[in-house]
Amino acid sequence: MSGDAHHITQPHTDGRGAILAMTCALKQSGLHPNQVDYLNAHATSTPLGDKVEATAIRTVFSDHATSGSLAFSSTKGAIGHLLGAAGAVEAIFTVLAIHHGVATLTLNVKEPDPTFDDAFLPLTASKRCRIRSIILFLGLDDNLHYNHSSKTAI
């Protein structure tokens, strides 16, 4: 667990809580950021939250986030923000993504952050992919890492 202790609903503008959450998940897993296949973003669809999270993703994953080799998406466009239940529902979606080898869609995105133009951000159609290692970013202070050792599609 990690947190920036900035505000109950607003992240610190430099993304320190999200950076700490994802960095801790990577450290605990023993993985390098380039070894992560999928990231489930918190993506609250708030201007501040999305900007801070995008900054944190770029900081932690650098070129890996924009090259197309890291798939990332969010389920909130499909289900809304379920407040206290959001993390559990995102975890379920992510486990299903791993099980089926399909990154979840990011629905209702009209203008993705231009920094991620070349990233694999499934907006309209799902794409089968081998998901071996994921980071599930559940918000300001929660993170989960899952590493699957299979060499084949799940």
Predicted segments, located by residue:
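Conserved "HGTGT" condensation-loop signature of ketosynthase/thiolase-family condensing enzymes
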Residues: 1-154
